[in-house]
Design a protein with these regions (language model features):
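Short loop/helix-cap segments at secondary-structure boundaries that form the rim of catalytic
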Residues: 46-55, 106-111, 222
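Catalytic core and acceptor-binding pocket of nucleotide-sugar-dependent glycosyltransferases
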Residues: 146-236
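Conserved donor-nucleotide/metal-binding helix-loop-beta segment in metal-dependent transferases, i.e.
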Residues: 99-140
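Active-site regions of enzymes building and remodeling cell-envelope glycoconjugates
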Residues: 51-64, 74-76, 115-118, 226-230
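Short, solvent-exposed loop/turn segments at secondary-structure junctions
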Residues: 13-15, 46-47, 63-64, 97-99, ...
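N-terminal anchoring/stem segment of glycosyltransferases
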Residues: 1-69, 80-86, 256-261, 265-281
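C-terminal catalytic/acceptor-binding lobe
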Residues: 202-289
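A conserved donor-nucleotide-binding helix/loop in the catalytic core
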Residues: 61-93, 101, 191-200
């Protein structure tokens, strides 16, 4: 019986190339050892370590300004659609991940025999919260919008995938929605992650496998999961203010208002949206317009 084929999609433009060597070494050794893996590396670097290895494909990708470097990732992947169609599974992984524990196919791949075609991972900041308190995009003008009374899971934008047909369909839908938003002068709150969460909220939960934050465990955090895949702190490696810009400091009143908006206001807004009968459409994976 042949091994399942897996394409790992990896973006490291600009300073993010610093993460590539350790990512490659740990994922090559520990991630899905039962599968035949190929690394698709989107980078503006003229060369990267290991790019002569037979399982590495270096693809030129111009470094985009923030936030387009993350907004446009679905579009980037689709430049390789013809090659990616040949694989059984496709997964995107953030540049700063380490796979220091063995992650098996049995525990990670979508269980297609049960109807699962996508793989998502809980975002660790929200694993113990309820949907009104998730950091969904709440702007009705945005195509990533989710009302306060809707949604089910909050998933990470930095590790996800699925069967090749299902994931490529997802990329087409989210690339189109992102471009339509940009044409309207709108950018989703958390960019690709907000778009992804709207897509997931439209699905039957039986269509995606949801893993715990053990597979997206931030460095130096303390949450009740045994780390399998670690998220390295980017600020220890690169100047994030140079990439994203410096966030303005909030004054006392602004901090109090922000705390109220995070801890109490969602209750009220969830009741409002329920009374207004707000809801999301339901689509079968791959058929989201």
């Amino acid at each position: 019986m042949s091994k399942p084929t897996v394409a790992l999609l990896y973006i490291c433009t600009g300073k993010y190339t610093v993460f590539w060597p350790d990512f490659y070494k740990t994922f090559r050794q520990n991630y899905l050892p039962e599968c035949d893996k190929t690394f698709f590396v989107f980078t503006d670097a003229p060369s990267i370590e290991f790019d002569t290895e037979p399982d590495v494909r270096r693809i030129y990708q111009k470094a985009l300004d923030w936030p387009y470097s993350t907004l446009k990732r679905f579009e980037m992947f689709l430049t390789q659609e013809d090659a990616l169609k040949a694989f059984d599974f496709l997964f995107f992984a953030n540049a700063n991940l380490l796979c220091e524990q063995v992650v098996t196919a049995e525990e990670f791949l979508p269980r297609t025999e049960q109807g699962e075609v996508l793989l998502m991972v809980q975002q660790p900041g929200f694993w113990d919260k309820t949907p009104p308190f998730y950091s969904y995009d709440r702007n009705p003008k945005c195509r990533a919008y989710i009302p306060y009374n809707c949604g089910r899971d909050y998933v990470s934008g930095g590790l996800n995938g699925g069967t090749a047909p299902a994931f490529l369909a997802l990329c087409h839908t989210l690339a189109r929605r992102t471009d339509d938003d940009l044409a309207d002068g709108v950018i989703a709150l958390w960019h690709d992650e907000s778009q992804l969460n709207r897509y997931v909220a439209e699905l039957d939960p039986a269509e995606y496998r949801l893993l715990t934050p053990a597979y997206w465990y931030p460095e130096d955090w303390h949450i009740p999961f045994e780390p399998k895949i670690t998220v390295r702190d980017k600020s220890k490696w690169i100047d994030m203010t140079a990439v994203k810009g410096k966030k303005p400091e909030l004054g006392f009143v602004a901090r109090k208002w922000d705390a109220f908006c995070q801890n109490y206001l969602p209750f009220v807004l969830a009741v409002r949206d329920t009374l207004l009968l707000k809801h999301l459409p339901r689509y079968k994976a791959g058929h989201n317009p």
